[in-house]
A protein has these predicted regions:
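A short Gly-Trp-Pro
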Residues: 1-15, 23-99
Length: 99
């Protein structure tokens, strides 16, 4: 399994970790209804090969303690990094770790 779904205070969250990263990403996801007025990502319902929309932009500290940023689409369990990534992963494909 590449992702885990859990509920916290009535909202559903999906958590996953990219290969090479030391921290999980946890995002609110829509499991019922549509994205209209929802502050959450749409999700394809698959824990093995999750797809989320819209894109994901995450700021984090690298191993040197410098703030950096990754920006990607999550498609079928693979992180498709966009060209504006500032962490050296621009235009790369990164799989998700097993949970």
């Amino acid at each position: 399994m590449k992702a885990k779904l859990f509920n916290f205070q009535g909202s559903d969250y999906l958590t996953f970790t990219l290969e090479g990263m030391f921290f999980p990403v946890t995002l609110p996801v829509i499991t019922k209804g549509n994205r209209s007025k929802a502050n959450a990502w749409t999700w394809n319902g698959c824990l093995e090969k999750p797809t989320l929309r819209p894109s994901i932009r995450t700021k984090y500290s690298n191993l040197e303690g410098e703030e950096t940023e990754i920006h990607y689409w999550l498609n079928d369990g693979v992180c498709d990094c966009l060209s504006d990534c500032k962490d050296g992963n621009a235009n790369r494909k990164i799989p998700l770790k097993e949970i």
